[in-house]
Amino acid sequence: MIILGIDPALGSLGWAVVAKETAQLKYLASGIIRTNSKDAMHHRLAFINSTLEKVILEYQPNMAAIEETFVNTNSVTSLKLGYARGAIMSLIGRYNLDMREFKPNTVKKTVTGYGHAEKDQMLHMIKLLLSGTALITNSDEADAVAIAYTCLVTKNY
């Protein structure tokens, strides 16, 4: 089972690919997709879509796991995040991948044992749980790894 974990965002989207081989979890790759806030929205969304598509084609995941979002007090921010999620979900659907969504607190509790863990705690635990993640320093990337990890360890596939 190969999971593509996604921490959705418009400016700095985290992605990660984690596999389960027999009882062993294996980190395969991760990264950040950054868009320029000065670019037109449709160009930013197209860039997210085309970059994630390359990841899907390279790693051939069986499923995508994405973090659920909550409505922010800033409606413009929530709307922009919704655009990014729509572009991501459209791509997931185009490749006929199953998809699971996880609440941020569920991911934090699965990885750290505490549903309100801070970013640095998440990063630390990801490095302990999955070999190959030692060079990850970006919290968006670490969150994507954590989302994929959560999908695999909760057997939510």
UniProtKB/Swiss-Prot annotation:
Its EC number is 3.1.21.10. InterPro entries: RNaseH-like_sf (IPR012337), RNaseH_sf (IPR036397), X-over_junc_endoDNase_Mg_BS (IPR020563), X-over_junc_endoDNase_RuvC (IPR002176). Binds 2 Mg(2+) ion per subunit. It holds the Pfam family RuvC. Belongs to the RuvC family. The RuvA-RuvB-RuvC complex processes Holliday junction (HJ) DNA during genetic recombination and DNA repair. Endonuclease that resolves HJ intermediates. Cleaves cruciform DNA by making single-stranded nicks across the HJ at symmetrical positions within the homologous arms, yielding a 5'-phosphate and a 3'-hydroxyl group; requires a central core of homology in the junction. The consensus cleavage sequence is 5'-(A/T)TT(C/G)-3'. Cleavage occurs on the 3'-side of the TT dinucleotide at the point of strand exchange. NCBIfam families: ruvC. This is Crossover junction endodeoxyribonuclease RuvC. It comes from Rickettsia rickettsii (strain Sheila Smith).
